[in-house]
Amino acid sequence: FSARPFANNFNHEELVEAVKYCHLRGVKVYMTINTLFNENELEMALNEARFAYEHKVDALIVQDLGLVYRIRQEMPDFDLHASTQMHIHNIAGINVCKKLGFKKVVIARESSLDFINEACKQDIPIETFIHGAICVSYSGQCLMSSATKNRSANKGACAQCCRLRYGLYENNKRVPTDTDYLLSPKDMSLLSDIPSLIEAGVSSFKIEGRMKSSYYVANTVNAYRRALESLEKNLPLSDEIYNETFKSSHRKYTTGFYF
């Protein structure tokens, strides 16, 4: 029920052990159930939420409002975070999340820095996406995979159609292009812009990782953690920190929609 069903996800037994392992080390565990559900699936999703609640998962990251309603009825003290898949991209959306009892809002990765500054004034913790792939469409709203491959991106089964080769044609004649990857966006990297996000009041950062290798995750998280520690000491970000994000396979970097 997560937006990354093809990742090497936890089973129930592994989840229980992971929660114990993390809590012994002072680390919180957030579980994603952040796809949309039809009527036949909602009870199964709720069962997963019950299991997470009973085994002390700290919060659920969710998208489906029907699931939110059911959890609020049955487990009112279970913390919920609004997933980036909810595509919260305006202040009204943040205020709705507050009224629904969310404890944190992960705003859309298409957000600008101006919006982030306003979002962080709304008296609810804001999480922003800072590193990883960006969508050629609107993340959480793309139907290209469903239309061409019968695989729903909003069910976590995106076929990555935007990453394929395409030709550009005009009047039935192919137009020369610098690349055949005409729809494939660059990867986002906001390492050098962390000071602006901290100043805005962002409470936590989101780094893509569940479909990546442990090597990629370790390098990327290490780079951003070292950057935060340097900023806390009023030190500039060293080339060594920047180079950490180039050790793993990635596309060319961009600041995405932030600036």
Residue ranges and their predicted role:
Residues 87:
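Beta/alpha (TIM)-barrel catalytic core signal, keyed to glycine-rich beta->alpha loops juxtaposed to Asp/Glu
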Residues 91-92:
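Conserved nucleotide-cofactor-binding alpha/beta core module
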Residues 1-5, 14-35, 39-53, 62, ...:
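Surface-exposed amphipathic alpha-helical tracts and adjacent flexible/coil segments at the periphery
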Residues 66-67:
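Alpha-helix capping/helix-boundary segments
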